[in-house]
């Protein structure tokens, strides 16, 4: 409560807020006693760690944009949408500055050693990641649907469409229709690195919302293509979602799988382009994964990293990630 964060985890705490807001949206009577306090406390206190929720890591900032948009959706309190829009401006001002277009991971001078470990981040501007560019597209698309004429007509939708055109031409989506981790800055080509589950999920709700804005099904069609390809390429024989690091993820990568699960639930509940067979595939995916978590990855309500088991040590990242899948399954039941 002192920091408004969970275990001092900065961007994972944004995902906890998003998960709880999602739970609140579908089960308000069950959630309200918890979420009323969480939303107000985190909103008031967490930015004491980084004023304005800005730390120069564009992906971190954009996770908070998505969190406060989700909270706005369930509270209708404009202060949350105001905050999301304010945070977004930092990334908007930086978009397009890389040699390949798009957005960097991080401002060169940004680093708070007490909160973040920089070993994996691009302090020297040597890589352009998928994550921050997916988050940018999704954040812009969501802001466009909630503030289509503020601060001016087209302000956000133009950013979302620009980000979409950049992303599909970037090469980040590979021949298997899944998304690699980034671009090689020397060649502006797909770096062929890890295919993480969260990179398959972040884009999905933004693409679905672009179809809402434009009436063009191609955006939602791409979301379905990526989602189905991820289920094919990132699940085990039992259909349980995996990540390349599942036997040794760090505290950040522990968060990843839940992002994909939450995105699949969004498509089931809110996508306007979804045939019955694809919907059934998504619903089954969520239920199978939630059941596996509870049967094989849960001890005394503590949820571990590997959704197929064996049971492991829980952290706020593994807990909230697994809860994304469980909440998702409940929301589509």
Task: Enumerate the predicted regions with their spans.
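CBM-like carbohydrate-recognition segments
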Residues: 1-59, 63, 71-74, 80, ...
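Long alpha-helical scaffolds in large eukaryotic adaptor/regulatory proteins
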Residues: 27, 75, 140, 147-150, ...
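Active-site cradle of extracellular carbohydrate-active enzymes
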Residues: 133-136, 140, 144, 153-210
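Acidic, serine/threonine/proline-rich low-complexity intrinsically disordered regions
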Residues: 148-154, 212-221, 270-283
